[in-house]
Amino acid sequence: MGPYSVFTAATILATVAVTCNAALVAQTSKEWSQCSGGEGPIVDVIISGCSAVIHGGHDSPKRLATAFNNRGVVYKFKGEYDRALDDYNQAILLNPSYANAYNNRGVIYRLKGDYDRAIKDYDEAIWLDSSIPAFFYNRAIAYTEKQDYDRAIADFEMVLRFNSKNALALYGRGVVRLKKGDSQTGSADIADAKAINPNVAEEFEHSARR
């Protein structure tokens, strides 16, 4: 877990107006640029920038939550799931309404095989912001791996409501229908998905591993 509680971050924020100077503003801007990937997608640069923001403590709880979340994304990319989980936990502590952090933590739980916790986090992300198709897609993957096929199909269909030509959702629904023994509609979904994107099978497998 990161070193800053909500109380600590709020206390620091209250004194920024007194202690801040031009050099500090410039430094913080650079650190934020690194943390957001604005200086290139080099993972160690992003981690360094986010860590500097976090340990500096000169931002609001929501901004600090963003730094924890961004660093968690990079740790996940590096396969350091426990570190990513710690950062997402801290992001949610700092900003309990942070839908992306719940979604990202759900991904970690799913990759660790804890489908119930993953689904609970996806539920929370969707409750906070139901306008993001990726949240439904990620929950569909978790339901698929849990072999809860009807719920998986329902979530793939939610993604298709956003975009009926979403090849990944079509392919995923087809895969689940085949698993249920519905070969006709399952094969049709897969064929439609491949017509949209010939590489969809590989991309679907990749999305399930991320």
Predicted regions and their residues:
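Terminal, low-structured helical/coil segments at or just beyond the last alpha-helical repeat
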Residues: 29-34, 178-179, 183-210
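N-terminal leader/linker segments that initiate helical-solenoid repeat arrays
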Residues: 20-58
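Structural marker of alpha-solenoid helical repeat scaffolds
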Residues: 56, 60, 94, 128, ...
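Conserved alpha-helical positions within TPR/SEL1-like repeat arrays
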Residues: 36, 66-76, 89, 100-110, ...
